[in-house]
């Protein structure tokens, strides 16, 4: 039986990545969809070889600067030896898309706060990562809740 993903649903998702290519380009971990809210439950980072670090952030709207595509850092691991694991299990949520920009940055009213929640644009927000060195090899396991409020 297929998993229901329509409006009004809430499902637990998991995604697994083996990041061993030889570059340090930004990598999309979760791609936001309009009127969805993503609550990340855990990110497990396993160093397959000795690794410099891994940086994870949300790429989205900055409610202070009123800027689109801002990198809001969540964590950066320390260097890990081969076979070591870093677990980030602080819960956080982010909206699937950016809001309509408001002109009185920083956020100062309930109406502006509602604009953020309304997700009135189609500009996706992302959970992203990048590794510290092109020789780093990371295995990631991400568990999250996807709430579809369309």
Language-model segments: which ranges?
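Solvent-exposed serine/threonine-rich low-complexity stretches and specific carbohydrate-binding patches
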Residues: 13-17, 71-82
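Compositionally biased, low-complexity repeat tracts
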Residues: 2-4, 65, 77-79, 92, ...
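Beta-sandwich interaction modules
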Residues: 84-126
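A short acidic, glycine/proline-enriched capping/turn motif at secondary-structure boundaries
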Residues: 83-84, 134
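Short, surface-exposed beta-strand/strand-loop-strand elements in extracellular ectodomains
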Residues: 50-76
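C-terminal interaction-tip segments
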Residues: 1-35, 46-55, 112-150
């Amino acid at each position: 039986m297929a998993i229901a993903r329509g409006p009004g649903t809430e499902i637990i998702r998991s995604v697994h990545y083996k990041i061993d290519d030889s570059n340090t380009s930004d990598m999309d971990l979760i791609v936001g969809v309009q009127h969805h809210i993503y609550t990340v439950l855990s990110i497990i980072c396993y160093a397959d070889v000795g690794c410099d670090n891994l940086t994870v952030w949300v790429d989205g709207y900055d409610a202070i600067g009123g800027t689109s595509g801002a990198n809001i850092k969540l964590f950066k691991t320390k260097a890990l030896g081969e076979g070591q694991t870093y677990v980030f299990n602080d819960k956080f949520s982010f909206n699937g898309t950016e809001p309509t920009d408001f002109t009185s940055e920083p956020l100062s009213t309930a109406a502006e706060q509602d604009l953020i929640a309304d997700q009135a644009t189609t500009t996706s927000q992302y959970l992203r990562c990048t590794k510290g060195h092109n020789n780093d090899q990371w295995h990631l396991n991400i568990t999250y809740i996807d709430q579809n409020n369309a």
